[in-house]
Amino acid sequence: MSKTELLDRWTIEKSEELYGIHNWGAGYFSISNQGEVLINPFRDTPEAAVSLIDIISGIRERGMEMPVLLRFENILDSQLSYLNESFAEAIATLGYQGVYRGVYPVKVNQQQQVIEEVIRFGQRYHHGLEVGSKAELIAALSVMKDQEACLICNGYKDEEFIDLGLYAVKMGFKL
């Protein structure tokens, strides 16, 4: 079979299957009828979708070269909402008397912009952070302002780590 014949038989569905986009895209990524990867920043909202090719073209028009790191705050915000609202729904359905306080494990992505967005958007849910090192604890203390949010300290605790944690408690944080 020639390359042309193969391409003539190729479908969007075959691209979706080949790349497993339904397995990892979670409604935030899809493939257009033109075969381009689309970013759906508000999950399953095709009217808000943006072509990855258009994003790359815009980046190049600004004189930037590849590779670049693309960060979609809307996706992070949407996932924080989904997580917290799912727990709120389960709590209400089951008549649970406690509250849910989510925490973001800093080790997953320590980039300042990500941590700041988790804190900024997550404040409505009192979403906190989980840290496992002195550096992470110091970073968390510098951005956390909501004293209803939890700050979870995991990992090896030397005297300095414990002192930092005790100072955080004095500052009003829940550890």
Features from the language model and the residues they span:
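N-terminal basic/disordered segments at the start of proteins
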Residues: 2-45
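Low-complexity, highly charged intrinsically disordered N-terminal segments
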Residues: 32-110
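Short secondary-structure boundary micro-motifs
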Residues: 11-14, 20-22, 51-53, 58-59, ...
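A general structural signal for short secondary-structure junctions and capping/turn motifs
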Residues: 18-21, 27-30, 58-61, 142-144, ...
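N-terminal start-of-chain detector that recognizes signal peptides
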Residues: 2, 8-11, 74-77, 102, ...
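A short linear-motif detector with a strong N-terminal bias
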Residues: 7-10, 16-18, 46-48, 81-83, ...
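Active-site-proximal beta-alpha core segment in soluble small-molecule metabolic enzymes
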Residues: 95-175
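Short, flexible coil/linker segments at or flanking structured domains
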Residues: 17-19, 64, 94, 125
